[in-house]
Amino acid sequence: MCKGLAALPHSCLERAKEIKIKLGILLQKPESAVDLVIPYNEKPDKPVKIQKPSLDEALQWRDSLDKLLQNNYGLASFKSFLKSEFSEENLEFWMACEDYKKIKSPVKMAEKAKKIYEEFIQSEAPKEVNIDHFTKEITMKNLVEPSPSSFDVAQKRIYALMEKDSLPRFVRSEFYQEFIK
């Protein structure tokens, strides 16, 4: 640690860490310049205001990953927390699977399935999720003919992992604790 930071009171350093975590999602760059382009004939959508949940809603997150993931503010908070721990791949996989299930076109479904597989499932994938060999095999077999349920087994395993591991860490984090004060 540099001498300048060592001279600061511990509470200042802790507050700086909290701010970094809370702003983490805002500091991300778009994945490509295409994300910044607005098509000529479309009007940009009004930004969705994420309303801060009530204390009661936030307290329910402790016991229910479903409630956390269904709340836009909770989802954004959870994602920021996981990014701060460099462990966001499970949530990103779960979200990609949710988006995948909404696809109607068989061609687009096959393309998205391939992308999800290459990004999260295959060995040495850039964001490889931690699933057992049996689950990988089932998922690979399901992808021979992609359907909305192709990733269900893997998604359920990852959900269980987040529920057992990530959610308790999030609930114990200063980020969540500050929020419910």
From Swiss-Prot:
Coiled-coil parts of chain: none
Domain named RGS: residues: 64-180
Subcellular location per the Swiss-Prot or TrEMBL entry: Cytoplasm; Membrane
Pfam families to which the protein is assigned, alphabetical: RGS
Any Gene Ontology biological process: negative regulation of signal transduction
Cytoplasm found in the keyword field: yes
Keyword Membrane: yes
InterPro entries: RGS (IPR016137), RGS_RGS5 (IPR034956), RGS_sf (IPR036305), RGS_subdom1/3 (IPR024066), RGS_subdomain_2 (IPR044926)
One term under GO cellular component: cytoplasm
Keywords assigned: Cytoplasm, Membrane, Signal transduction inhibitor
Major subcellular site: cytoplasm
Purpose of the protein: Inhibits signal transduction by increasing the GTPase activity of G protein alpha subunits thereby driving them into their inactive GDP-bound form. Binds to G(i)-alpha and G(o)-alpha, but not to G(s)-alpha.
Listed name of the protein: Regulator of G-protein signaling 5
